[in-house]
Amino acid sequence: MGGRKMATDEENVYGLEENAQSRQESTRRLILVGRTGAGKSATGNSILGQRRFFSRLGATSVTRACTTGSRRWDKCHVEVVDTPDIFSSQVSKTDPGCEERGHCYLLSAPGPHALLLVTQLGRFTAQDQQAVRQVRDMFGEDVLKWMVIVFTRKEDLAGGSLHDYVSNTENRALRELVAECGGRVCAFDNRATGREQEAQVEQLLGMVEGLVLEHKGAHYSNEVYELAQVLRWAGPEERLRRVAERVAARVQRRPWGAWLSARLWKWLKSPRSWRLGLALLLGGALLFWVLLHRRWSEAVAEVGPD
């Protein structure tokens, strides 16, 4: 990944935000996630209505770095981030310093409105499950509340219902994931063109709009996105270095540590957290004083005159 390309991609994204501040509320940021070979790049091209991301059929990744593309849809400016092999069991080898994962954060800052988990219809495998675990490790457990599952090879349904397929599948892991994602699923035929292609995009972006309404306009965020915003005006290399370090710290923590950190960050972001914290502190101090007073009274009674 060239440093200049990284800087250009990030400058393009931030430039779009600066040039569109008056309509920032209508920007929709999407991240394509999932295992290698599931069809992320082809799905991204279908969403954009143009061949923006390099794509070909195969089991190995042809995407080498996070890349962005954009389009207008209705009154929204849609930004799509395509991702390379950063969600597999080999990610510690393919991205040892977490630079590409940091790059993904920077290109989608201040946070995505939806993560699109791309998987092939009828082929939700152990690799897909591993990719979901990597997504959770990278972004946090709550990220599934912002996730839509996109099945490629819609043509294999042969006119059947996607919801019937999901409901009747014997793949327990898939059923559980769909439930965790609130039942948000759609299917794409990435060879479709014209009105058929646009109908697929309409359905998907309609789900994204539903997520935006559900979350009252809020995009997904965590402590890494917060850092990316703090460093927004730093140089691109410094920004990437700092964010990559934070991502590395997040993914290398034990699961319970990551969960605790996410809950603490969410609690601190709550407008009522300081009041609750103060109440807990005062309550603890009062309890300590009561216990201490009781022990003192008991001690006095023991040594007092008969």
Swiss-Prot record:
Region (G2) residue spans: 61-65
Gene Ontology molecular function: GTP binding
Superkingdom in the source lineage: Eukaryota
Primary localization: endoplasmic reticulum
Region described as G4: 152-155
Transmembrane segments: 273-292
Membrane topology: Single-pass type IV membrane protein
SUPFAM superfamilies for this protein: P-loop containing nucleoside triphosphate hydrolases
Residue numbers binding GTP: G34, R35, T36, G37, A38, G39, K40, S41, A42, S55, R153, K154, E155, N190
Region annotation G5: where it falls in the sequence: 189-191
Record's keyword terms, sorted: Endoplasmic reticulum, Golgi apparatus, GTP-binding, Membrane, Nucleotide-binding, Transmembrane, Transmembrane helix
Tissue: Predominantly expressed in the spleen and to a lesser extent in the lymph nodes. Detected in T-cells.
Cytoplasmic domain ranges by topology: 1-272
Region entry G3, spans: 82-85
Region (Disordered): 1-21
InterPro entries documented for this protein: G_AIG1, GIMA/IAN/Toc, P-loop_NTPase
Compartment(s) where it occurs, according to its Swiss-Prot or TrEMBL record: Endoplasmic reticulum membrane; Golgi apparatus membrane
Protein name stated in the entry: GTPase IMAP family member 1
Species annotation: Homo sapiens (Human)
Lineage: Eukaryota, Metazoa, Chordata, Craniata, Vertebrata
